[in-house]
């Protein structure tokens, strides 16, 4: 049994679940390609925003969503007591399970940020293998939606070879998204949180170096620019602390996996120290 993804767009129905920053951009991208899309979110404000950008088939009522060929999970995942809170993904998979039929296998793609092992767990425990399941972590950046929007180089992993092929057919062939195929779905799951943890550490280094430079009576920007003349060095700017929700959250996803986290936990401490340092300078 294979997912129904036809050459003609009218053959395929897609459902985007979670219409926040990433889900809304994804849904708009799909609608602009004239594909049959349904959007779902528990928030009335999110539903209203979707309507304002031209997504007309959108609802807060899961029962209104028809059976679909593709389900894209774009729900927010956060932290609870400093550990990953993935309950929204589990709840969404339970909703999708109700929509699955024995005769066909829909494609389910988890775009939300998760930890290694989650996809195979929901594949076994919730779907009982009755779907094609892939993980395609988003790299969406709202400040540059053209270059870093839905259609940019992304990573894909599947729970099995059939799932991977279904995912490739949809993302690469239908949506036109360039893909790097990970060696396993666990590698794809690790990819997003590792990328953001790496970025966090880079910024924390710049923050610490700025404090060191000023302690020594040096101008940090002058030192940074001098260092960056070397071909393999690119020290980032140190601004107002590491903000947003993705980087601070995702580095904690990584540190929650293991005790081998001294560098990353140190980066978290540096950012706290840097914020306090900035406050005391005013």
Regions found by a protein language model. Name each.
Residues 3-66:
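NAD(P)+-binding Rossmann beta1-loop-alpha1 motif at the extreme N-terminus of oxidoreductases
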